[in-house]
Every structure is written in C-alpha cells, then in structure tokens.
Amino acid sequence: MSDCEEKIYSNDYVDFIISKDVLDVIDLSSDCIQRIDEEKDTYFYPRSFFRIFDFPADSYASVPKCYGLLDETALEVSGILKLQQQPALALKGQGVMIGFIDTGIDYRNPVFQYSDGTTRIYRIWDQTIRDGTKPEGIAYGSEYKTEQINAALRAENPLETVPSMDTNGHGTFVAGVACGSEDVEDNFIGAAPFSEIAVVKLKEAKTYLREFYFIPDSVPAYQENDIMMAVSYLDRLAKERDMPLVICIALGSNMGNRGKDGQLATYLDIVSRRRKRCSVAAVGNEANARHHFLGKIQPDMEYESVEVSVEENMPGFFIEMWANAPELYAVSVSSPTGEVLPKVPYRSGGRQEFVFIFEQTRVSIDYRLTGRRQGNQLIYLRFSNAAQGIWTINVYPQSIVTGDYNMWLPMRNFTSGNVFFLRSNPNHTITVPGNAGQVISTGGYNVANGGLYLDSGRGFTLSGEVKPDFCAPAVNVYGPGLRNRFVTMTGTLSLIHISEPTRQEAIS
C-alpha cells in the first residue's frame, strides 16, 4: 500500500479540494495529491497542520462537503413504456453508458445481466476495497472489469472473485429502476434495459468530517471529493468506449455554496457541457423539513430575528447563512434562557466562540467571503452540545442592496435530533447538486393522485433558474433490492426515470 493511499483513507489526514486558479495565486504543496482533472485536485495534509477554517486557500469551498442518500405502474405514467414500444424510437438505452455514483451494486442480480447470463456492467470502481487493482491514475480503491465480473458469476462463490457488494441496497435499487433488464415473472423492466452500466461505490466520509458536521454514526455520508473523483472516472470510461454517458446521482446535501462556486455543482456543469455527456440529480426531500429560512431586511429595520427550535438536547448542529454579493451582514445569538452573545462585528475571516453558561452550549461564528468569482458572504454558525429550546439569531444589515439572505440547516437525516426554523420557507430547498445549471434535476409526484410529492425539493435556484427540470413518480416506486428481491421505495429517486429520455440529449 502506498504512503499516499494510506493518507487518503486515514482520519489523521484532512482533505482539501484545490482548484487550479487557487494555485495561480497561492503556493501550496503536499506529498500526497490526487488529481481529479486538469482543473481540480485533492490535497492531503496532517490534521495537526490545519483547522478546517484555517486553510490558506478559499477555506470553506476547499473543505469537502458531505452528501447523503436521498430517500427511495411508475414507468407507464412517466411515458417510459411508450418510448420503449414506439417503433420509430424504441428507446431502451442502446449504445449508451449509464454511470451510477452510490452505495455500489449487487452485480449478481439477473436484472444486470444479458439473457445469456453475462454481465451488462462494464466497470465497478469500489472505493472501499484497498487490496485490488486500482484504476489508472487513481491512488485508492479497486477496479473490476467485465471479464472479472463474468468470471465471478460463473464461480460457486462470486464474492470471492469480485468482493464488491452493495450492503445498503440504495445503489442497486437506483441502477435497477434506471436500467434493469426485463424480468417477466416479477413484472419489471428498467427505463433503459439495453444500456451499458458503470458503477462507483463510494467510501464513507472520514470521521473528522462527520464530527465537524455532527453527522450521526449510523447515517451513510460521502465526501464531495470522492464524488468528484467518481464523476471524472465515469467520464474517462465513456471516452474509452466512445459512448454517450448519463451520470446518475441520487445523493444530496444542504451544505455549501448554492451559487456558481460550489465544487461538485461546478464540476458537474463542466462535464455536462461536454459532447455526449449528461448528468441527472434528484432534488431531495427537504421541502417540508423546515430547514430553510428566507430572510428579508427592509431599509428601516435594525435587525431581523430568526428562531430555531431544538426539540431535545443534541450533540450539535450547524447553520449556513448565505448572502449574494455585495450584501453583508452580522449576527448575534440568544439562548433559550435569554443569555446573549452580542453582535459579532463583521470581519472576513473573523471567528468568535462563546459558551452559554446555563445551557453549556458552545457557539462558534465564522465570517467568510467565498468563491473567487462572486465573493458571496457565508456566516457559519456551529452549535455544540445544543440545548433544548428556542434559539434566536438576530441578523444585522451591514451593507445591503436587496436585503435578501438565506439560511439552511443540514438535511434531515444528517441531524441527530429534531431541529427546525419556526418561520421556515419551502422554496430554495433543492439539494446540491440538483441546483447546478447544466444538471437535469428531477422532482417527484404521487402517481396515485397526480399531485406533487410534498417533500420534493422546490426551486428556484438562487440565481433565478427554473428547477426542477422534470418531475417523475416518487411514491412507492418498484425496483430490485438485495438478495434478488423486488421492493418499493419513496422519495425523489425519480431521477432514475429520466435516464433513458435524456440519452437523446447525451447523444446529441
């Protein structure tokens, strides 16, 4: 095992995503660098070198965000069967590669095989397996090719030959509904049953990031830089095969810049602009989570109060407040017992910590101007040992034009207790990267009544773009699970119905 590989997996090393334009103005070096593409790399440093917000580059943008799994008749209502059966079209995924970035795939399931029992999977890159053959140019994980998978399928114990396995079932379900082969007995067919399949099984986020973001141990979470590496890998595979590529991402996050400088969203936009490339992402299930606050300060207002309810004591949570340039704000915090952290004056790069005596809650406030293009303001509020009750954040205008700002709490499965805004707003609740301009984002509706799936994330984007682009069935979707069984799931995994219709866009 190489020294760099050990650093990629080790919790004693922190990961930073570095763009080429940062290197043009800041001299950075590391003895472990993983190339993502010509424009972006991941640098690895000992944890003792940097606190997360102390990195000399664009600190918060460089810190990998964590992404979680989005919750889980449909084909007929979507119009998929009409496309498959229309003689002039017969759209079933022929000549298209569909790539999945998720929890892996149960390659033994017959829905991922041809009628002769051979696999439809071109490659599996399993980031969690460290003792196999690594993909070219990548310092971690193990790659399994078609020939190896076919050999495994012929073996008495396939997992001894290809040990990659989806132990969660999420990735198998997504891939099956998107492109599973027909199973007449179980009345099932995927949207693109003749497509070629490529899979990346993501490794879990490092412990230091889970602790920083207060993500419960039992919840799957994945790092932004690993997802970006997966996108780069799939793009390279499609180049090798000279095939159109549709990238399916059933992951989402409330973390990071919702504008033009988010790392994953920006990278997906770059890849999706390339010929024969298309990216599809779900919009998430955050509309009714009460995790978004839309602020508006009028010129005659001294401040606006934002109330956050913490229903039980919890290890912690964080709030990201974003304002578009040239807006600038400052904040103060009041505890449930009335103790006040006075207004922290705005200073870019400034940070203040305060421990509330009665609650024993530690609150840290970081001010940042983010991105090298826009300079949008981020105020990052982190509550450790969060006490039960109503916490109040007073937002003070420092320099305003519109008076608009937004706050987001983490996705609901990334919090260990019930925390929400008392005056929440369901708009702007599309999870990243579903807000990216070049990514096809899909919301969900209920087939039974034709109504919108109420939890489905809602637009617009902060730049005013219309999102989601499509809606598809999201309630009781039928698809393959583990152990060759079929299951139903609910949520904006509706993106999987969009994969075959978008292949025409990928081809063109």
Q: Where would I find each of the regions flagged by the language model?
A:
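Subtilisin-like serine protease catalytic core
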Residues: 86-223, 315, 326-327, 436-438, ...
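Catalytic cores of secreted or luminal carbohydrate-active enzymes
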Residues: 264-294
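Noncatalytic modules at the cell exterior or secretory-pathway interfaces
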Residues: 383-399
